[in-house]
Amino acid sequence: MGELFRSEEMTLAQLFLQSEAAYCCVSELGELGMVQFRDLNPDVNVFQRKFVNEVRRCEEMDRKLRFVEKEIKKANIPTVDTGENPEVPFPRDMIDLEATFEKLENELKEINTNQEALKKNFLELTELKHILRRTQQFFDEMEDPNLLEESSALMEGSEGGRGAPLRLGFVAGVISRERIPTFERMLWRVCRGNVFLRKAEIEDPLEDPATGDQVHKSVFIIFFQGDQLKNRVKKICEGFRASLYPCPETPQERKEMLAGVNSRIDDLQMVLNQTEDHRQRVLQAASKTMRVWFIKVRKMKAIYHTLNLCNIDVTQKCLIAEVWCPVSDLDSIQFALRRGTERSGSTVPSILNRMQTKQTPPTFNKTNKFTSGFQNIVDAYGIGNYREINPAPYTIITFPFLFAVMFGDMGHGVLMTCAALYLVIRESRLLAQKSDNEMFNMVFAGRYIILLMGIFSIYTGIIYNDCFSKSLNMFGSGWSVRPMFSPKGANWSFETLDGNAVLQLDPAVPGVFNGPYPLGIDPIWNVATNKLTFLNSFKMKMSVVLGVIHMLFGVSLSLFNHLYFKKPLNIFLGFIPEIVFMSSLFGYLVLLVFYKWTAYDAFTSKDAPSLLIHFINMCLFNYNDPTNKPLYRGQMGIQVLLVLIALACVPCMLIVKTMVLRRQHLWKKHLSQKREETPAENLEQSLEQTGVSSSCTGLTQQGTQKFGGVRVGNGPTEDEAGIMDHDQLSQHSEEGDEHSEEEPFDFGDVAVHQAIHTIEYCLGCISNTASYLRLWALSLAHAQLSEVLWTMVMHLGLSSRSWGGFFGLSIIFAAFATLTVAILLIMEGLSAFLHALRLHWVEFQNKFYTGQGFKFVPFSFESILEGRLDE
């Protein structure tokens, strides 16, 4: 199996980076995105690491940029995105960036502070202007003799007349419009009705300088008598957050004051406009480089985070890092390190040393925009073990095909294909838009999955001969009614047609059935009353056939895993019993289906036995049923043999494998005791004689040295020793039988594990086969929904014969199209998608796919900037 069908071969490597070149080397590795750094300081607190101060400085710069970005969005200024990917700035450039951001932040804060103060002053002057205008109207109204009676109660002991209102005190102010009713009630109750309130709404909304919101306010003036009422009124105004302003008592003073306020408002408006223009210029200039600044800062922050994962030499001149990387990309990584060293100006080259380890490497499957969606489907179930067979390449075909078996409709498939083609053709433009809609992004990410699902749905729709619940008669039906009227046939007549609501064609009559339809199902079945009987039988058998083939393919893939990981025990006591067990029972059932289809024709079909009864009798060893005739000679002997073979496979998987594992453990234990008794000088000779290779021999021959406080091996080179051979890395205990010598062996645990696996597989073969019947059930449901929608909606418009039928048909077609998309494409499509997902995760992948690995997460600027990784 090539690299396409397995994860990439990985290696653990050690990087020796000079302190002055480490920053640039990590920067180049981030641009490459092919190494995953390991944390060599797991016990060191995050705040006690070497580059924590640099990380904090980057976070502070990021905070300032977010503040500027917030101001840009508040001003509705678009951010320029040229798609440029700037290089990472050097560490010495951080000071310049900090100074730039500090200056920009302070300038914006100063502008905002001044602007807020100016707006607050402008608001106060505007409110005072409205007060002066409205109070003059109030006083003019108070001069009206008709209103004197209303205020007479406030002037106890007065003589009345024109000068009476001037004896009253008053306050004027502005309050939010929604608080007026409560404010008025409070004044009435607290002052016991001894105040006189006049109010008027300000027509234009006023801008709140603190929030920038538009607020509706009202002007009020309160007349009262006495200092006690005055204090009460002011406290109430203060409680309701009303703004009080001084208002002259004489009309002349009010007029002069209004003129002065208008003049100040004009001057203030001019200053506000200039301030806003300056603010816009600053923000527009910042918006042009905002994205570039963000990229630079976040790249720097990511680099320093990564450097904190490294170990530092005691001389402070070298950084040591450990990384997982694909073997196929080692040359690219070496080249990136060389570029980083040259950029930094260092004369000492960076060193990449491949290490030998027993740790399980991460799983890395290379994908492109086409295969990434299918790989995500597999990874959602579980990340594959290292170098395990990857189901994604097979899923590219099997997933949309099984979906189409359930969804099969030519018309719906065309609609789905067109929608996916739109996303594929315009993918560059849609990617550039960077939509925040999660639902759209999810659909867009699976555009190639949807495209294949649509194409396969067209194919299965052709096989089913189903287009919006109607059949297409492209080649002419293979059935004919005319021979039934002949004397050699059923001797039908027109009276026969009139006297029978339902008549059945006899394919045994010559000329009635002229052979199968060239492509798909004969369209005559679309008008037959026994359509469901025929289609249900066909689709049910087809589901079982496809399911058994799919599962057998999954079991067959496990063979390649056992061969690759060199586990002959799993082949002879795992794969072979599993494939034989399934083939003996369900593979035989598939052969019976094809045999019955080919062995019985129109003349003998009435004598065809039931496969279901045959299969049940086969498992129960019941061959005395006279109602169910045998299919072929010697059927009893063959079926008994197959059942016995299947039953023999169960103890082979359950008991034999467990005993062999125990025997292997005892043999290893015997060898280890023999090693302890054998003198050290004869150990290697005895190992050579027994053919057992010591994994530690190479290590004992290799010396070690101290390199900056870190113990580093100085063993042979890659060519001499083949360091990090993929076979050594790929060793993992898939079935619990490949344990190292140090691992304890518990016979009870192994027996229980093997019993669970055997029972799960045997019962799973039965339940999984039945589970594939969902292909038939979903296909039937989709076809029936499509037919109901056509009959209940579209048929009404097409059957109209009136002059308004065209307009009615237009409305009905719109409803039909909406329901088709909403119910059949989206809801039914999602249902079929989920069922296909289950068939792959449970019925297919559990035959060979462990899915207990961990994903390769490389240090990549692209992933960090797209938000796929935490910074």
Language-model-detected regions and their locations in the chain:
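Long, charged N-terminal accessory/stalk domains
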Residues: 1-395, 399, 410, 423, ...
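Conserved, carboxylate-rich catalytic/transport cores that coordinate ions
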Residues: 2-11, 18-34, 182, 292, ...
